[in-house]
Amino acid sequence: MIYWFTGQPGSGKTVLADLLKEKFLPHAYRIDGDEMRDLFQNKDYSMNGRIKNIDAAQKIAHYLHNQGKDVIVSLVSPYLDQREEFKKLLDWQINEIYVHYSNEIRGREEYHVLGYQAPQFNYLDINTSEQTPNQSLDVIREKLKV
């Protein structure tokens, strides 16, 4: 299974993805947006640069999924169409987890993506303003049967 955490920078994607791996899926592979950018030397935050980074993460996740591995991805991945096409490609074997928060300051607001397209259907909504990371993880585990 692929667990795809999406949301604005600073929303808690990486924290929740790391907790999911640590507590419930220790053998899963982790793909993180910042690490992908370092690995492929992609510091281009334009729309094309983001699409390229997300496409690379999707290819790696798809490959690992085809090998029977669980994959946990945490990426801003702001483009709805790109995420939906990936879900269709994998016959909807992806759990999309939309991580967001209220208007509080978290320290990475300068990296926010203008025009981020929130999921519209077939996703789990996690508002990290309303619960601790462990409470959010409990919701993920319960709703997705991890």
Predicted features by range, described:
Residues S11, A17-H62, N66:
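Conserved substrate/cofactor phosphate-moiety recognition/catalytic segment
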Residues A28-R30, I94-Y98, Y123-D125:
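Conserved beta-strand scaffold positions in the cores of enzyme catalytic domains, especially
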Residues H100-V146:
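Small-molecule kinase domains that catalyze NTP-dependent phosphoryl transfer to phosphate-bearing small molecules
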Residues F5:
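Hydrophobic anchor at the beta1->P-loop junction of P-loop NTPases
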Residues Q8:
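P-loop (Walker A) phosphate-binding loop of NTP-binding proteins
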Residues F24, L89-W92, F121:
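Short, structured coil segments at secondary-structure junctions
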Residues M47-D91, N95, Y101-E104:
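Glycine-rich phosphate-binding loop used to anchor ATP phosphates in small-molecule kinases
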Residues I2:
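Walker A (P-loop) ATP-phosphate-binding motif of ABC ATPase nucleotide-binding domains
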